[in-house]
Amino acid sequence: MNQTRVFLIFAWLMVAALLWMEWGKDKAAANAPVAAATQAVPAARDPDAAAPSAANVPSAQPIPQAGAPGTVPATSSTAATPAAAGAAPVVTLTSDVLRLKLDGRSVLDAELLQFPQTKDGTEPVSLLTEDPAHPYNATSGWASEHSPVPGVGGFRAEQPGTTFEMAKGQNTLVVPFVWNGPDGVSIRRTFTLERGRYAISIKDEVINKSGAPWNGYVFRKLSRVPTILSRGMTNPDSFSFNGATWYSPQEGYERRAFKDYMDDGGLNRQITGGWVALLQHHFFTAWIPQKDQASLYVLAQDGPRDVAELRGPAFTVAPGQTASTEARLWVGPKLVNLIAKEDVKGLDRVVDYSRFSIMAIIGQGLFWVLSHLHSFLHNWGWAIIGLVVLLRLALYPLSAAQYKSGAKMRRFQPRLAQLKERYGDDRVKYQQATMELFKKEKINPMGGCLPLLIQMPIFFALYWVLVESVELRQAPWLGWIQDLTARDPYFILPLLNISIMWATQKLTPTPGMDPMQAKMMQFMPLVFGVMMAFMPAGLVLYWVVNGGLGLLIQWWMIRQHGEKPSKIIQANAK
């Protein structure tokens, strides 16, 4: 397979992939409002108004049992106690990286203080929000069939005041809340924030000073009305996965997009040692229970809200006894190094390089190299260039093999033309004679294609690394490029990319190319240039450097194999 056809195949594969993603995104956007309007959960979804049946909260410690797929466990009235003096006041907790507004039961608003919404702005990203158009909350509460549990507004801060801030030099902020129920039952909830950490520790202690056993289970959920993204090939937010993900030791990493949220009837599954999360571009929220505690994992819809919930563990607390449960709530960016510090199996997959494990592994390896280059170069733009250079050096033997195969094929083009003239329209005899020639001269017709097929997964994985890595968000390179995730404001990199593609075409020998292929090749630089004009500068930088190095390698290989680059350019210009 000659070099031109290989390039053409690769180019059209890229265009086809981008068009397919664009079509899928537009189709999802058209269907999303209908799904939100038609899917609803039973009224028993609200744990403040309902709870599992007696069979689901036994006197021992198992969690509520899963029902049939797509259903919610049978429920009846909860013995929830109303707040003694109305809704609890909203309390603000502030660390160096987070500002949370909560009522003791729900985190109503979460601002990421080190991530401004815009490059030049000061307003931080609000990941959790009370915005009535797109509410997004994290909630943890208790449910029971017979025993009293805290309702909305039931938890109150133990300390006076509504604002708690981590002081300079302080590494932790601990804020306890308490619910005092009837008959001597109380639940103490403690929020712990740590400096530089996006995982919030939430510990509940059930203290039973009554004269009867207390039965109940904890639930933890994430709920949001998904934002309908503007769809476009140049919008990285629409490329990224948006939806729920969960992990179990048995099944591994799984995910469900918001547009497909109730496919296969949602989710009802008992899991020990997992986690559940809602993902969007660059950021995510997750509930991470204790490793040894089992929970019922539920995906459902509550009107326009998509809900991901953990139910359990369940407790029976004897009179005079105490029981506790603890979980982490992650609210923050997909920072690889901080996620690794949480030491949670499978949580690294929230950096969603691909739903396929092999591509995700390649992506993780590429980011590992990229991050180490950044630690040395202190600039993500130069780190991208360094990574492409290393990849090109590592893959040089494949590129050389690809070109040598193409050069060998070109040397036998006159003989192939003679065979075609000899056998005319007898395609069978022509193919037989061609294969005999290949066998005699030890030519592998796939020699130019196989190296490309090996390289493609690596470069596709690198593309997703650049799209998904929050570390590159609003990061500058040099001069006019002050944000690698925004488009080039002066279109310099896209124009360079067009020039490099044009030069590559002119340098590529094209003997025997039919007129249709030649016309298609002439338009390819322009097609790619238009697409690249509005893509993030970091991606275009990758393409420019990769294409430029490819051009240099091709020039070198042509000289090595005795062909005159100037003559090739003159021939292709005709």
Curated annotation (Swiss-Prot):
The chain crosses the membrane at residues 6-26, 356-376, 380-400, 447-467, 489-509, 525-545. It is a multi-pass membrane protein. One of its GO terms (biological process) is protein insertion into membrane. One of its GO terms (cellular component) is plasma membrane. Residues 45-77 are annotated as: Disordered. CDD domains: 5TM_YidC_Alb3, EcYidC-like_peri. It is found in: Cell inner membrane. Disulfide bonds: none annotated. Keywords: Cell inner membrane, Cell membrane, Chaperone, Membrane, Protein transport, Transmembrane, Transmembrane helix, Transport. GO terms for molecular function: membrane insertase activity. Belongs to the OXA1/ALB3/YidC family. Type 1 subfamily. Required for the insertion and/or proper folding and/or complex formation of integral membrane proteins into the membrane. Involved in integration of membrane proteins that insert both dependently and independently of the Sec translocase complex, as well as at least some lipoproteins. Aids folding of multispanning membrane proteins. Interacts with the Sec translocase complex via SecD. Specifically interacts with transmembrane segments of nascent integral membrane proteins during membrane integration. NCBIfam families: PRK01318.1-3, yidC_nterm, yidC_oxa1_cterm. This is Membrane protein insertase YidC. It comes from Xanthomonas euvesicatoria pv. vesicatoria (strain 85-10) (Xanthomonas campestris pv. vesicatoria). The lineage of its organism: Bacteria, Pseudomonadati, Pseudomonadota, Gammaproteobacteria, Lysobacterales.
